[in-house]
Amino acid sequence: MDLVLKRAFDIFSSLSALLVLAPFLLFVALLIKLDSPGPVLFKQTRWGKNCKAIKVYKFRSMRTDLCDVSGVAQTVKNDPRITRIGAILRRTNVDELPQLLNVLLGHMSVVGPRCHAIGMRAGGMLYEELVPEYHQRHAMRPGMTGLAQMRGLRGPTDRPAKARARIASDLYYVGNFSIVMDMRIIFGTVVSELTRGKGF
């Protein structure tokens, strides 16, 4: 029943948000076009449910000539690839709003383990090598936010310890999922965004 409620919530919330935010999303698209040449949206292949590859949508925040389509090259502070508008979009997480379309289409969920690019590494090791149970996190749809993000585990995972901490949170979520937990994560994410700062 919890999974049925989760999908119903995903459809209702993503469709409502897309309709309400449509004028704002169009305004952001215009700013991106005026700021730098290239497409408004950026598509990237990432892990989906049951280890199926999915295309995830984001507002383009980087220069097209320097963009890493694979997503393996993680973003760092003061990254020279990021455009002026892109810096604002990433800092406020507005760049991720197009993922509402992924949620509506059933590729993603509002809450779940964050979708990783295929071939992610930390300390030179693939995530699958760092944590043998890594792919268990893909038993559920990836989310726009998750337990790890609520706990403030953000930014580049350049060290194995950082990657393991996030994956541990993801595995805990998959093993203990409930609709009540999802509501707590949504509330906790909002609090975390307001108190711990934004991304880059």
UniProtKB/Swiss-Prot annotation:
One annotated GO biological process: polysaccharide biosynthetic process
Family in the record: Belongs to the bacterial sugar transferase family.
Keyword set, alphabetical order: Exopolysaccharide synthesis, Nodulation
Coiled coil region boundaries: none
Organism phylogeny: Bacteria, Pseudomonadati, Pseudomonadota, Alphaproteobacteria, Hyphomicrobiales
Record-level Gene Ontology MF annotations: phosphotransferase activity, for other substituted phosphate groups
Record PANTHER family: COLANIC BIOSYNTHESIS UDP-GLUCOSE LIPID CARRIER TRANSFERASE (PTHR30576), UNDECAPRENYL-PHOSPHATE N-ACETYLGALACTOSAMINYL 1-PHOSPHATE TRANSFERASE-RELATED (PTHR30576:SF0)
Protein's UniProt name: Exopolysaccharide production protein PSS
